[in-house]
């Protein structure tokens, strides 16, 4: 290996030979031939450009970035230029300790980012006036659609009995939000009615309504009047609110809102041509068991110390599966953390000061335009003006001066002011409009200006009064606070994270560096395409790369998570079936081992789930599949299949399985969660799939960010290409296409720069090698630990794919549960593998290609050592190393030590541990206590523990 491959892949030539020798093999090709069925192997290498060196790639991506025109955009429409404080950019966005962590399932080693997320939830609850917020969602439009479906599933018994299924959407909502709401509503049988608020009668044949606050073109709606009408007729209210406007406007809770959604992008998150950004979703506590996404809640550890955890997880899709109200299984953690630190850094006074500046500059612009005879329609507004003028002429002058407005038609346009806007910008805007409208300009000067927020809507309540938002306003203080939280969390900067089905590989610095460049991160998603040629070229190349890798003909980058990719793929199948007059087909076959998002996505796409069992080897039960496919042949829509399977096995009969589906009129959807075992060796097209999603945050090196962002593009066969998702503002597909799946045309486009770099630097050979070494590493771990743990499933030749499942259920006879092993691994400095998925009481281990032999051996040594510790445990005595794990520094430095093992055995169980000891900040967290006493904001926590 040479070039970037040798940096990305952890195993060197000598280590490779040693590992192969341990497995009794003479080559990696020998291993692959025993692992992947020959009938699905690729016959030639991927047709991709040669691999770039790291410096070569950075030169290339910089050159490409210069094709983007970095104009100042006053377009608004849910996206505004923001200012990322340098202390946050350097210490979080560019810090692998933050961006390489995983979703905080292991609470004891995730207290830092969960505190940041608790701060985020507090900001959202304070600004919206609601009781409960989640830890972020994918984008504002997705949040709005989730609100509609949550309230639909929460209708009263009378409404369900009367089939009340209409949902009203104000026509001054964001266009992308209306489109996404319509996408989600149709397969669920929800009738969306779009109209003017002042013409809507709020009749009780509607179960809910949606309002924008302020509206799309800036006017502040009379939520008080409309809220009263809605409540008097039993309608639930969803409000999409601007986060900065809420600093000056009354909270939506004052007007009876049941759900408040929006985006926190304005709190220091770059535009990124559409994302990733953290959306918010706030609601009443009565919906706590229905709210989508993650919630961080306060609990306590076994010593009664305050401890954070993900609350109410039993409501989520991985538990409820096809009964879940949402398929959301990720937050936008990295972006939510950044937004929370923005709130901590600026504090309530600083945030209000920024909001006032935005409003005052908007008023100044309004007054200046009126002076030169330009008509502005909004009487009340926060940051956006609706203006009359010759738009074509004004657009020409604006683009000559490198600024963008939102052009509505040939007589109207709007301008949205943002945090980065200066007095000079206001003068330039006035000059541009004056020239385009053939008027004489005026000199703008900022003096005292009258607020354009109605008196009845001026915010009276304070916000962010908790101590944390009032003490870290210097850079030194915030830097230390960030570092304090960082030290509480285990990430890839500390050790291997072997989470099965999660692919925690290297996120190389050279892939990450460009996302900090303004030429990539400061582009508005709705600029004219000629201003984003760098992005357009990158997107086109990345789509072609993914087509080549999957064997398919078309790709959409729009889905901004794996679960959204699943939904998008199924909606594409649905649209295709409708186009051939087969819309009655609605049965989706799903193996029992599938990830919980699969059945949840199928239900959201209007399909009925029929579960297929697995045999004792972990394969799909082919006989049952045939019987159920034939039973439902008139209505069969799709099979959802993960390949290799979630059991870590390449099923040799996969082509026969997909043929059964096609023979019975269905389409095959392949879940791409395990694509890291396919790239360069086989592909979804060869196995017989029609569509798949990919997890760019797994296989293609986008970091997990502590629980997001994710990107879940879909790749489709030729007959499905016309149905790929579209966008109402920028047309990216055909007339037959599915409507919006995400808010932005290309989803989280900024993150795609990372995957583009990954593919460009590895090239065809490097990608293939990455897959081979991922499989080698998994099989080496299997070889090392199989004498100590039962390996549940393996292929016909005794090989694992890129992951393996160990059975921990026999240890119950020693009083040990799988979670005890997970917590004990913390004492050894490791994050646990995936626990109890896809089989309860097991662990699924996936090492990826990025780890070296020393680290893999340390992990194996830890697992073997723990297995020996299990033998010394008994049901009768829970006072043991595993049941007491993890052990904190506070615990072992205490004078009192009432344990039947030494302090050294507790925290330094093997020699390597002391060289790089990771100390958890809390002991075992009490999950049940946290759910019984739900606390999801950062009010002084000591008072809660006392009570």
Regions found by a protein language model. Give the residues of each.
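A conserved hydrophobic secondary-structure block that centers on an alpha-helix together
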Residues: 123-144, 163, 167
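General small-molecule cofactor/ligand-binding pocket signal
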Residues: 133, 191-195, 377, 406, ...
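Conserved PLP-enzyme active-site core in the AAT-like
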Residues: 112, 142-307, 369, 382, ...
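N-terminal export/assembly segments and adjacent metallocofactor-ligating motifs
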Residues: 103-113, 119-121, 134
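TRNA-binding/sensing appendages of the translation machinery
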Residues: 25-39, 257-262, 689
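Conserved phosphate/anionic-ligand binding catalytic regions in large, soluble enzymes, centered on
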Residues: 269-282, 286-287, 331-335, 416, ...
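Non-catalytic terminal extensions of PLP-dependent enzymes
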Residues: 1-22, 34-71, 83-99, 105-108, ...
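N-terminal cofactor/phosphate-binding cores enriched in small/glycine residues
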Residues: 28-30, 339, 609
């Amino acid at each position: 290996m040479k070039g970037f491959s040798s940096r990305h892949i952890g195993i060197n030539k000598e280590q490779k030979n040693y590992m192969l020798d341990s497995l009794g093999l003479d080559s990696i090709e020998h291993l692959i031939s025993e692992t992947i069925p020959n009938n699905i192997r690729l016959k030639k290498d991927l047709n991709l450009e040669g691999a770039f060196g790291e410096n070569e790639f950075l030169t290339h991506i910089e050159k490409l970035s210069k094709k983007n025109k970095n104009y100042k955009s006053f377009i608004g429409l849910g996206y505004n230029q923001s200012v990322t404080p340098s202390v946050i950019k350097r210490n979080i966005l560019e810090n692998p300790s933050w961006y390489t962590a995983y979703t905080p399932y292991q609470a004891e080693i995730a207290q830092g980012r969960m505190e940041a997320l608790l701060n985020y939830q507090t900001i959202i609850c304070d600004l919206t006036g609601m009781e409960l917020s989640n830890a972020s969602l994918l984008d504002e439009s997705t949040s709005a659609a989730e609100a509609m479906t949550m309230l639909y599933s929460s209708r009263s018994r009378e409404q369900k009995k009367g089939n009340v299924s209409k949902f009203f959407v104000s026509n001054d909502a964001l266009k992308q939000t209306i489109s996404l709401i319509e996408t989600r509503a149709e397969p669920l049988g929800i009738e969306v009615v779009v109209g003017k608020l002042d013409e809507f009668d709020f009749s009780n044949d509607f179960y809910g309504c949606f309002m924008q606050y302020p509206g799309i073109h800036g006017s502040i709606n009379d939520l008080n009047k409309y809220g009263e009408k809605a409540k008097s007729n039993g309608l639930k209210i969803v409000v999409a609110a601007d986060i900065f406007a809420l600093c000056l406007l009354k909270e939506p809770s004052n007007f009876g809102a049941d759900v408040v959604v929006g985006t926190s992008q304005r709190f220091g998150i770059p535009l990124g041509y559409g994302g990733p950004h953290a959306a918010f979703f706030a609601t009443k506590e009565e919906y706590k068991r229905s709210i989508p996404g993650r919630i961080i809640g306060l609990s306590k550890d076994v010593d009664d110390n305050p401890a954070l955890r993900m609350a109410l997880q039993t409501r989520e899709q991985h538990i409820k599966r096809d009964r879940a109200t949402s398929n959301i299984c990720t937050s936008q953690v990295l972006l939510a953390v950044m937004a929370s630190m923005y709130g901590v850094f600026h504090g309530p006074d600083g945030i209000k000061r920024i909001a006032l500046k935005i409003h005052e500059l908007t008023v100044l612009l309004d007054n200046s335009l009126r002076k030169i005879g330009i008509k502005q329609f909004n009487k009340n507004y926060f940051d956006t003006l609706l203006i009359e003028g010759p738009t074509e002429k004004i657009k020409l002058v604006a683009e000559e001066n490198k600024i963008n407005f939102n052009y509505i038609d040939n007589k109207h346009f709007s301008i949205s002011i943002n945090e980065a806007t200066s007095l000079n910008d206001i003068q330039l805007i006035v000059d541009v409009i004056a020239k385009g409208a053939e008027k004489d300009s005026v000199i703008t000067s900022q003096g005292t200006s009258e607020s354009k927020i109605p008196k009845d809507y001026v915010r009276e309540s304070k916000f962010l009064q908790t101590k944390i938002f009032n003490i870290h306003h210097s850079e030194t203080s915030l830097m230390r606070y960030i570092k304090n939280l960082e030290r509480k969390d285990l990430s890839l900067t500390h050790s291997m994270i072997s989470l099965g089905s999660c692919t925690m590989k290297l996120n190389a610095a050279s892939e990450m560096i460009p996302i900090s460049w303004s030429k990539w991160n400061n582009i508005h998603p709705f600029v004219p395409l000629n201003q984003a040629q760098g992005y357009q070229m990158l997107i086109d190349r990345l789509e072609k790369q993914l087509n080549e890798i999957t064997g398919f003909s078309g790709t959409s980058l729009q889905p901004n998570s794996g679960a959204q990719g699943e939904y998008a793929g199924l909606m594409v199948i649905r649209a295709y079936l409708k186009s051939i007059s087969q819309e009655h087909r609605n049965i989706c076959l799903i193996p029992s081992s599938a990830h919980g998002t699969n059945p949840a996505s199928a239900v959201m796409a209007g399909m009925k789930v029929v579960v297929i069992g697995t045999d004792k080897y972990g394969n799909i039960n082919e006989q049952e599949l045939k019987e159920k496919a034939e039973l439902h042949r008139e209505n069969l829509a799709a099979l959802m299949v993960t390949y290799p399977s979630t059991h870590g096995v390449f099923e040799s009969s996969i082509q026969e399985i997909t043929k059964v589906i096609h023979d019975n009129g269905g389409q095959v959807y392949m879940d791409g969660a395990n694509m890291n075992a396919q790239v360069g060796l086989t592909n979804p097209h060869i196995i017989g799939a029609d569509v798949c999603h990919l997890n760019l945050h797994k296989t293609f090196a986008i970091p997990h960010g502590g629980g997001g962002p994710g990107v879940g593009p879909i790749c489709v066969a030729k007959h499905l290409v016309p149905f790929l998702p579209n966008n109402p503002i920028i047309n990216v597909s055909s007339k037959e296409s599915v409507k919006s799946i995400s808010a932005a045309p290309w989803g989280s486009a900024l993150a795609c720069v990372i995957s583009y770099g990954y593919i460009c630097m590895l090239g065809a050979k490097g990608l293939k090698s990455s897959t081979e070494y991922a499989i080698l590493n998994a099989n080496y771990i299997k070889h090392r630990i199989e004498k100590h743990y039962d390996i549940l499933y393996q292929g016909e030749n005794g090989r694992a794919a890129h992951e393996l499942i160990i059975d921990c259920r026999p240890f119950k006879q020693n009083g040990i549960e799988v979670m005890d092993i997970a917590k004990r691994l913390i004492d050894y400095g490791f994050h646990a593998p995936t626990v109890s998925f896809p089989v309860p009481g097991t662990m699924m281990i996936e090492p990826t290609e990025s780890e070296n032999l020393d680290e893999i051996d340390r992990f194996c040594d830890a697992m073997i050592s723990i297995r020996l510790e299990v033998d010394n445990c008994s049901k009768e005595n829970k006072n043991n190393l595993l049941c007491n794990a993890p052990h904190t520094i506070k615990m072992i430095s205490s004078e009192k030590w009432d344990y039947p093992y030494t302090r050294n055995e507790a925290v330094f169980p093997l020699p390597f541990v002391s060289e790089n000891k990771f100390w958890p900040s809390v002991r075992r967290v009490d999950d049940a206590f946290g759910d019984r006493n739900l606390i999801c904001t950062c009010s002084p926590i000591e008072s809660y523990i006392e009570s």
